[in-house]
Amino acid sequence: MSMTDNVADMLTRIRNAYKSKLINVSFPSSKIKTSILDVLQKEGYIKDYIITHKNNISYTEVALKYSVNGDASICEIHRVSKPGKRVYSAIKDLKGYYNNMGIYILSTPYGVMSDREAHIKNVGGEVICKVF
């Protein structure tokens, strides 16, 4: 069975891994997933990720980040723009998520970036997901 939303699958795997207190999680790799993981790493939500190749298929393995007392660094991670309903936003219409404690991840003409970086560059785009 083919998968229609690879990004939602990645976000669900990360969310389930945090709920299960796993150290690592892996899933099939793609360019958009790598771009989203770059933003998550830059914002401090994950430790690191590596791309491995098995049987001519590339996989991404993500090292999850926990606090000293064992709390997950990601409390919520949700898909906003879906294949059936794309959500676009100008940067002036995008309010802070959880009083600027969380982030939106946007796909812009300048690449995938957080809402904080998009505010600096004054550019809007497709709202991929929100993370807190």
Curated annotation (Swiss-Prot):
The keyword Cell membrane does not apply. InterPro entries: Ribosomal_uS8, Ribosomal_uS8_CS, Ribosomal_uS8_sf. GO terms for molecular function: rRNA binding; structural constituent of ribosome. SUPFAM superfamilies: Ribosomal protein S8 (SSF56047). One of its GO terms (cellular component) is ribonucleoprotein complex. Coiled coil: none annotated. One of its GO terms (biological process) is translation. The keyword RNA-binding applies. Gene3D superfamilies: 3.30.1370.30, 3.30.1490.10. Keywords: Ribonucleoprotein, Ribosomal protein, RNA-binding, rRNA-binding. Pfam families: Ribosomal_S8. One of the primary rRNA binding proteins, it binds directly to 16S rRNA central domain where it helps coordinate assembly of the platform of the 30S subunit. Part of the 30S ribosomal subunit. Contacts proteins S5 and S12. NCBIfam families: PRK00136.1. Belongs to the universal ribosomal protein uS8 family. This is Small ribosomal subunit protein uS8. It comes from Rickettsia canadensis (strain McKiel). The lineage of its organism: Bacteria, Pseudomonadati, Pseudomonadota, Alphaproteobacteria, Rickettsiales.
